[in-house]
């Protein structure tokens, strides 16, 4: 996909000129000039779009097309309005099978041109994204290949930033959408190594079962023991500032989750290929950071395995010793994500991080609580919470803070081990899962993102979303600017 900027939009710049207009303001100068050339055509068309979101097409204007979209009154043109208009425009362009367009939307009142440009590009790229295709007979495909923006105040720098973000999001989505027979723990490791070969500032180490055993990662090994696919611990570094403490992102990389002996229902089990979306987001963020050349140190740690059923699979009631030395009684084999994360979070201690954020499709309970709009997050660190909230607001990648009160820890008590891996009832499932993780994060500042509701769209049109890559990149940009 090609994105560009122009100061002088015209009809012949692309297949379609898209013009957003206000109901209470005159046309901008460039549109007035085009209107005069076309004998008042634009003003006539504007009369046919009285309400926000109304559109009108005019084809064969000097061999090109013109799309007018009503944006309402200037005072009411908000970030939410922008999102709606961009969505309507993108869907219209794709439906009409245009390959190129010049988009001229008004400036927002409260946001910078740089921010607006990033949001438009991220949204257009999300909507034009096409699933990986394994069909043997291909329908003739069509893509929107080029969009040029007219947005006074936007710069080439902001354009390049937006392109880096969508590159990271696309990489995340491609990995998450991959079928589990292809995207195995080994494949994830290979993708991380591939990134290190693409960028000089990235290095990578991928560890297998023997190294994992030597480090005492009993929880990760327990989850993996039911599968023929060997587990992987992926340790990938982006070296952007050798003098600063690293930020660490820990990703859950369960490439397929049957639930183990606590087996999941058959309905929609195919979507459990998305249980490695946390790992995919970590790799997507690292790729974007390398493209942006952010002056930070960033480490991605991914604990990857399959959670399957076999004669050697871990059983309910088994007790394992984690890398931290703490013991866990496995009450539910379908609460496996927190087990692999426990060892990965302990592994993170060696780097003396500034802070750690884990990203995981961890609980169905967070979907019950928040649906697919906001990612649930938990932390005890108020400064980190403020940073996450700020980044979420700026990136439009929504979050909602959930409690992490000490009283919830009681649900994890075990008569036989230091803790159980899941509560005996279904109450506060996302909170008690975070409480479990908190027991492995006492040596650094930490936050947990539960993306089970936001990492993919379920059903017939199932598709990875690429979240929370935009949120995390925005957070890291603030970290970079503070150093």
From Swiss-Prot:
Subcellular location, record wording: Cytoplasm
Keywords: Aminopeptidase, Cytoplasm, Hydrolase, Manganese, Metal-binding, Protease
Catalytic activity: Release of an N-terminal amino acid, Xaa-|-Yaa-, in which Xaa is preferably Leu, but may be other amino acids including Pro although not Arg or Lys, and Yaa may be Pro. Amino acid amides and methyl esters are also readily hydrolyzed, but rates on arylamides are exceedingly low; Release of an N-terminal amino acid, preferentially leucine, but not glutamic or aspartic acids
Entry's Gene Ontology BP terms: proteolysis
UniProt xrefs under PROSITE patterns: CYTOSOL_AP
GO (cellular component) term, any one: cytoplasm
Free-text cofactor note: Binds 2 manganese ions per subunit.
Annotated residues for binding of Mn(2+) 1: 257, 334, 336
Transmembrane domains' residue ranges: none
Principal EC category: hydrolase
Main location: cytoplasm
Pfam families hit by this protein: Peptidase_M17, Peptidase_M17_N
Signal sequence region: none
Cofactor: Mn(2+)
Binding-site residues, Mn(2+) 2: 252, 257, 275, 336
EC number of the protein: 3.4.11.1, 3.4.11.10
PANTHER family: CYTOSOL AMINOPEPTIDASE, LEUCINE AMINOPEPTIDASE-RELATED
Family as reported in the entry's similarity comment: Belongs to the peptidase M17 family.
Entry-linked NCBIfam families: PRK00913.1-4 (NF002074)
Name this polypeptide is given: Probable cytosol aminopeptidase
Protein's organism: Legionella pneumophila (strain Lens)
Gene: pepA
């Amino acid at each position: 996909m090609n994105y560009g900027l122009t100061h002088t939009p015209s009809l012949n710049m692309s297949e379609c000129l898209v013009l957003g207009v206000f109901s209470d303001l005159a046309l901008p100068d460039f549109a007035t000039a085009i209107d005069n050339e076309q004998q008042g055509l634009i003003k006539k068309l504007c009369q046919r779009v009285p309400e926000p979101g109304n559109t009108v097409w005019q084809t064969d204007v000097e061999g090109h097309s013109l799309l007018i979209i009503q944006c309402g009154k200037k005072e009411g043109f908000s970030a939410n309005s922008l999102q709606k208009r961009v969505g309507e425009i993108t869907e219209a362009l794709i439906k009409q099978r245009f390959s190129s367009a010049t988009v001229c939307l008004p400036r927002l009142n409260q946001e910078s041109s740089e921010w607006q440009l990033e949001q438009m590009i991220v949204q257009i790229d999300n909507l034009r994204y096409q699933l990986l295709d394994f069909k043997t007979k291909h329908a003739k495909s069509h893509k929107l290949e080029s969009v040029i923006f007219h947005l006074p105040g936007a710069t080439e720098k902001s354009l390049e930033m937006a392109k880096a973000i969508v590159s990271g999001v696309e990489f995340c989505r491609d990995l998450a959408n991959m079928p589990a027979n292809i995207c195995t723990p080994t494949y994830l490791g290979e993708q991380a190594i591939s990134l290190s070969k693409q960028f000089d500032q990235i290095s990578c180490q991928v560890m297998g079962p023997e190294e994992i055993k030597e480090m005492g990662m009993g929880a990760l090994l327990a989850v993996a023991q039911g599968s023929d696919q060997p587990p992987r611990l992926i340790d990938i570094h982006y070296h952007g500032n050798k003098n600063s403490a690293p930020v660490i992102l820990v990703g859950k990389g369960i490439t397929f989750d049957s639930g183990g002996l606590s087996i999941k229902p058959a309905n929609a089990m195919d979507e459990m290929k998305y249980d490695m979306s946390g790992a995919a987001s970590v790799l997507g963020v690292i790729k974007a950071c390398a493209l942006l050349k952010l002056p930070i140190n960033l480490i991605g740690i991914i604990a990857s395995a399959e959670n399957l059923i076999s004669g050697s699979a871990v059983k309910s009631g088994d007790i394992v010793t984690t890398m931290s030395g703490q013991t866990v009684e496995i009450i539910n084999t379908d609460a496996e994500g927190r087990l692999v994360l426990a060892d990965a979070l302990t592994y993170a201690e060696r780097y003396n991080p500034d802070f750690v954020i884990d990203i995981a499709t961890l609980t169905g309970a967070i979907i019950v609580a928040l649906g697919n709009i906001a990612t649930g997050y938990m932390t005890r660190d108020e400064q980190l919470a403020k940073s996450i909230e700020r980044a979420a607001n700026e990136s439009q990648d929504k979050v909602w803070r959930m409690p992490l009160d000490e009283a919830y820890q009681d649900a994890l008590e075990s008569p036989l081990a230091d803790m159980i891996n899941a509560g005996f009832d279904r109450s506060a499932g996302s909170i008690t899962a975070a409480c479990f993780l908190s027991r492995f994060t006492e040596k650094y500042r930490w936050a947990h993102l539960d993306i089970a509701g936001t990492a993919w769209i379920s059903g017939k049109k199932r598709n990875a979303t690429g979240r929370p890559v935009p949120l995390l990149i925005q957070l890291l940009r603030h970290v970079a600017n503070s150093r």
